[in-house]
Amino acid sequence: RLHTYKYPGIYNVQITSTGNFPQIGFYKNNDYDGPYIIDTQVYYQASVTKIFNPIPVCYDTSGNKVTSFDYTFYYCKSLEAIPENLFSNYNDITSFKYTFAYCTSITSISENIFANQSNVTSFDHTFSGCYSLQEIPENIFKYNTQVTSFLAVISSCSGLTVIPENLFKYNTEVTNFASVFNGCSQITSIPEKIFSYCPNVTSFAGAFAAMKKLITVPANLFVNNTKVTGIGSLFS
């Protein structure tokens, strides 16, 4: 059911369910063009500013507990704060594609936000376009040891000035770092050992493209990445 508010403003909405948590979507009044309700895209483009509690257990249309938070907060431009226990009700998520992409008001992220997620394989575009983000915690991916793709995970995060050297230390299964730092225009240097623990990488395509202030690239940056086959547009 679609409910349209007559006047713009702030509304307190309470949602209850006698069974599975319902699939819902929030839309701006003039943007609605039909149901865009897919799994956990609960807050898609919503004007949410803060989240205080963990996401409750959600189920898909087949009654199975969700295993993906793809696009959940995509384009929530007003979202300012994310609790570190946001996903604490889950321990079997496999994908966080575009989860916080273009959440342009987020300035920080807890290093423990993905601590329970040991089965994740994809962080593609998770924080893409979060240009107000000031830093990325060094241990944010520490417990996500099954990840195979960090495609554009923090691309276009133009507020970042530093890349932690051990950011991917525990992600030894990664094969894809394409566009990983693409558009991080304030970063001036790359840590020499940032990819040292990732021997299975095959693609760095566009990894450092559009990094306008990049000055220093270590000579041994890729010394342990002997399986790489894709480096197109690496710095362009």
What are the roles of these predicted feature ranges?
Residues R1-S236:
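Negatively charged
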